[in-house]
Amino acid sequence: MALHTSNLGYPRIGLQREWKKTLEAFWAQKIDEQQLITTMKEIHLEHLNVQKEKGIDFIPIGDFTYYDHVLDTAYMLGFIPSRFSNFTSYLDIYFAMARGSKDHVASEMTKWFNTNYHYIVPEYEEGLNISLKDNRPLRLYEEAKRELGIDGKPVILGPYTFLKLAKGYTQDQFPTILHKLIAPYVQLLTELHKAGARLIQIDEPIFVSLTKEEMIEAKKLYEAIQKEVPSANLILQTYFDSVEENYTELITFPVSGIGLDFVHGKEGNIKSIVEHGFPAEKTLAIGCIDGRNIWRANLDEVFALFETLKAHIEPKDWIIQPSCSLLHTPVDKTEETHLSPELFDALAFANQKLEELTLIKRGLSEGVNSIEIEITTYRNSHEAVRSSAARNRKDVQTARASLKEEDFSRPLPFEQRYDLQQKALQLPLLPTTTIGSFPQTPEVRQTRKQWRNGEITNEQYEHFIEQETEKWIRHQENIGLDVLVHGEFERTDMVEYFGERLAGFSFTKNGWVQSYGSRCVKPPIIFGDVAFISDMTVKETVYAQSLTNKVVKGMLTGPVTILNWSFVRNDLPRKEVCYQIALALRHEIERLESSGIRIIQVDEPALREGMPLKEKDWDSYIEWAVQSFRLATASVANETQIHTHMCYSNFEDIVDAIRALDADVISIETSRSHGEFIHTLEQTTYEKGIGLGVYDIHSPRVPSKEEMYTIVEQSLKVCNPKYFWINPDCGLKTRRTEEVLPALEHMVEAAKEARTLLKTNA
């Protein structure tokens, strides 16, 4: 029985975000297509070489991309919407699908399962030529072999997951389209096998949440594929949860091996193996290192896991690997020496996780005693973190223990509150607003960098922020928006900003991960107990309000989003960490209210994405997520209007949860998802304030007034005009000023036209 190390995927962005910078240089026409291709090749080969040097036996090939691996698969299989047919080159089509263009709406973008990564949603339409348009995995496999002598492991998104993630077809069409995918996948696998690929990883993360009937359907698909490629060694890879509901079916699939997540699906997967065994003729790939978080492994638990498995099964081979792709972790921790010693020692980024895999292999091969020094070091680092003062704050623990039922509820029900708020705010019908942020121009970023480097004083930086704020208050007034925002020019990131001002958080210098396309984020680390220290947003918001007679919203990030967009300590339940954050935000909201701010927006874009993948686990998550939001917001007066915002989500599953938040107004991404939430509201009612986004801010394209009016018109068929707001999909931080101003002008024009029509029909 052989023992191997493997990786499921490696961060694309590069140690210094070289990947991001190359892409953006190409989009800005600072480099040409050939320079893009050459530089991307160099970055990819460097990533492969790192994994080789770390001792990984099966190095993934095909996880690298120019934008998104799901988009790669869509292009490869010919899922190219007809609206892009006038483009001729691969890159023009590819980036138009991802980002849109002046005349083309981009494909929808949404979260990859319950992670913080976004993928481009494949679109099916009648007449698609579903075929192997480009065998990209083969090209990359041969390149790695030729350039580096690496016999890699091609990684492919599986056909069942791919089609489940796609949109544009009815459920009745699913079996027919699935059948059409057999031929291109057979060709893809045949060519890889003939080229010498000794192992091919097929990712089917959707398998963790399929019904019995769907699993049987998926098995028939793989039987059809295996019949045509019988000698290819396929590893069917699952992750993000267990496969316990369908384990007995999965182990009969006609593949050489199966990969299971023993971190996020540990309990269910162990239970399945203990009860049902594992085929002796198959390889078991064991995801024993957390691919989604940044903490060092608990080696005692890892070796105990292997002892449990060995006691019940004898697979053909063992593969030691992360629980999922390392795409979700930063590249390397070596630059983070500014962190406290106990925190630094407790961290493991992607490169350190690869080292952990080789260490575990050595311990299993040569005996645990051979790595006793390393195990002792790990134990000491875990104990140092556990006993640290940051994780043992009595004030935080006392506040949590003192919570009462009334701390989670507003004094009056929504209808009564909203009437009081309308009297106080005097807003027009269909009020217009934005989601919060305005463009972070090169000047804004450069000035912030100068301030952080000590090149300008605090006073100079604050003066600059005030100038930007005033400029955009005037822009908003001139455009005719009804509720204004200060623009968030002082903030780098909607989570990082608050984490820097709360106790319990730590920050990396280079801990970047990919969010979507070239957009990278640097998640905070929730290391200790979270607590309020002092005002975080009051000064900037009050200043903005002093500049105008119109209402200015206070802008906060909600507790669930801060939790879901951070690397979270793994010694407490997530619910408890979220309650700590909510209590800290409650202080800030009370400070804003006492300073005269009458609308306070608490964004929760990550509420839906944090839901467990299995429906049986939803109720528990929704209960504490909703309670966390209410804990943060419930102490304000009835006249104070609480807003929230969500984006990138399949909201049909959580309409009841959205109601339960008891926010006075919610704004929701609508335009890029092609109006799916409008369809959801046709099936149910939502009698609270709501704004359905009227244009996609993730594309540089400026939509017309007519396009926005159409969305408003559709929305008003399912929403009460009394409670309806008009806004963009999301914040405008990543857009340019010359894109934002005309788009907002068109939005206000659309609102005026809609008001006129409503008054005419009244």
Swiss-Prot record:
GO biological process annotation, one example: methionine biosynthetic process
Molecular function, one GO term: 5-methyltetrahydropteroyltriglutamate-homocysteine S-methyltransferase activity
Entry superkingdom: Bacteria
Organism of origin: Bacillus cytotoxicus (strain DSM 22905 / CIP 110041 / 391-98 / NVH 391-98)
SUPFAM superfamilies: UROD/MetE-like
Free-text comment on the cofactor: Binds 1 zinc ion per subunit.
Catalytic activity reported: 5-methyltetrahydropteroyltri-L-glutamate + L-homocysteine = tetrahydropteroyltri-L-glutamate + L-methionine
Signal sequence annotation: none
NCBIfam families the UniProt entry points to: met_syn_B12ind, PRK05222.1
EC number in record: 2.1.1.14
Protein name, UniProt field: 5-methyltetrahydropteroyltriglutamate--homocysteine methyltransferase
UniProt similarity note: Belongs to the vitamin-B12 independent methionine synthase family.
Binding site for L-homocysteine: 435-437, 488, 603
InterPro entries linked to this entry: Cbl-indep_Met_Synth_N (IPR013215), Cobalamin-indep_Met_synthase (IPR006276), Met_Synth_C/arc (IPR002629), UROD/MetE-like_sf (IPR038071)
Keywords, alphabetical: Amino-acid biosynthesis, Metal-binding, Methionine biosynthesis, Methyltransferase, Repeat, Transferase, Zinc
Binding site for L-methionine: 435-437, 488, 603
Active site feature: 698 (proton donor)
Positions of disulphide bridges: none
Entries under Gene3D superfamilies matching the protein: 3.20.20.210
Pfam families recorded: Meth_synt_1, Meth_synt_2
CDD domains assigned: CIMS_C_terminal_like, CIMS_N_terminal_like
Pathway the protein contributes to: Amino-acid biosynthesis; L-methionine biosynthesis via de novo pathway; L-methionine from L-homocysteine (MetE route): step 1/1
Protein's UniProt keywords contain Nuclease: no
Sequence positions that bind Zn(2+): 645, 647, 669, 730
UniProt function note: Catalyzes the transfer of a methyl group from 5-methyltetrahydrofolate to homocysteine resulting in methionine formation.
Binding annotation for 5-methyltetrahydropteroyltri-L-glutamate: 17-20, 111, 519-520, 565, 609
UniProt cofactor(s): Zn(2+)
